Amino acid sequence: MPRRRRAVIREVAPDAIYNSTLVEKFVNSMMWQGKKNTAQGIFYDAMDKIRERTSDDPLKAFKKAVENAKPLLEVKTRRVGGANYQVPIEVPQNRRTSLAMRWIITNARTRPEKGMAEKLANELNDAANLRGGAIKKRDDVHRMAEANKAFAHYRW
């Protein structure tokens, strides 16, 4: 058990262009080595590419992509009587969002396209249309929770 107090969750200021805290959190989680301007440039380029392709509001597509990638259940390992069980638990709301954003970013980085903005635009577009790596990861997590439903009574 930690001996310190629980860390205070700080509010994130909304971004300048879309006035959205979700966008700012996404940019912060995409950032490497404190290079926020680079991360913002990549994100806004990706949003411009989405706007060109779909001629729709890119913020709406972004929110839909994050919403589609959110997991409802996940498994946590619990040790009971010398055996380890994968116990399905419900995911808290803030963890759902952070997992969805992390999966989108990770899968965008592994895509074969040229340039991160292009990769991110394609991954967001795929996630908004219920396909792509982030959605596959969410489905895998849900499948794992479904397979271990028998151990749900070990929940704590």
From Swiss-Prot:
Gene Ontology CC terms, in alphabetical order: small ribosomal subunit
Tell me the first and last residues of the signal peptide: none
User: What single Pfam family name could you report for this chain, choosing any that match?
Assistant: Ribosomal_S7
PROSITE patterns, alphabetically? Answer: RIBOSOMAL_S7 (PS00052)
Q: Does the keyword Ribosomal protein apply?
A: yes
Domain of life, per UniProt, equals: Bacteria
Give an example GO biological process: translation
Keyword Manganese among UniProt keywords: no
Q: Which UniProt keywords apply?
A: Ribonucleoprotein, Ribosomal protein, RNA-binding, rRNA-binding, tRNA-binding
Q: Name one GO molecular function term.
A: rRNA binding
Function as written in the Swiss-Prot or TrEMBL entry: One of the primary rRNA binding proteins, it binds directly to 16S rRNA where it nucleates assembly of the head domain of the 30S subunit. Is located at the subunit interface close to the decoding center, probably blocks exit of the E-site tRNA.
Q: How does it assemble?
A: Part of the 30S ribosomal subunit. Contacts proteins S9 and S11.
Q: Which family does it belong to?
A: Belongs to the universal ribosomal protein uS7 family.
Q: Which HAMAP family match?
A: Ribosomal_uS7_B
Task: Output this protein's name.
Answer: Small ribosomal subunit protein uS7
| Gene label | rpsG
